[in-house]
Amino acid sequence: MSLQLDSVKNRQKSWKSYILTIIAILMILGGVYLLVLIGTPLILSQNINPKDNHTTQLITKTENKITENRLYIPKIDINLPYSTGGAETMEHGAWWRKPENGNPKDGGNFVLSAHRFIMGLTPQQTLRKSPFYNIDKLTVGDEIIIDYNGVRYNYVIIEKQSVKPDAVEIEQRTDQPQLTLYSCTLGGANDGRDVIIAKLKK
């Protein structure tokens, strides 16, 4: 009888040990996958050729057939639609903030914002949801291209700023035609904003 009890106890211990091992393995794999999701934008950005990437090729192909409003940043391989509306527009591209304050055709301050980092369920989804992840890699002199209402506008970056989250002045109308791009810092929405200011090329 005691042998049978010992055998049952040993089997129970064996099952518990097996289950704990499976749980530990799943937790380790989950942690590794989480690191992959978090690191995807950073890892892939190391391989961007600023002179020859998907965006630079697309700009050349679409020059004579502009069909939608888009933002292109060749240096960091950004190719995004933009639209007015609310924050939900950033799920599919960039958000045109304060349209009444400016646009490429009429001048003023044309302001676009997009997510810096949003984790998706897959590496591809994380990359798609985090278009401005590499906005900090832009420098003065870099080119930004805007397609607006069937016309292509070329801008050059003249300034970079870091501002507080409540710095609403970055969206105010300007006397000169200006493009303003901004996104949260990697520290999050409460940490601040990285701002890019560009002027229209003549």
Segments the model singles out, each with a brief description of its role:
Residues 1-19:
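N-terminal Lys/Arg-rich, disordered targeting/topogenic segments
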Residues 15-21, 28-202:
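Solvent-exposed, non-transmembrane regions of membrane-associated and secreted proteins
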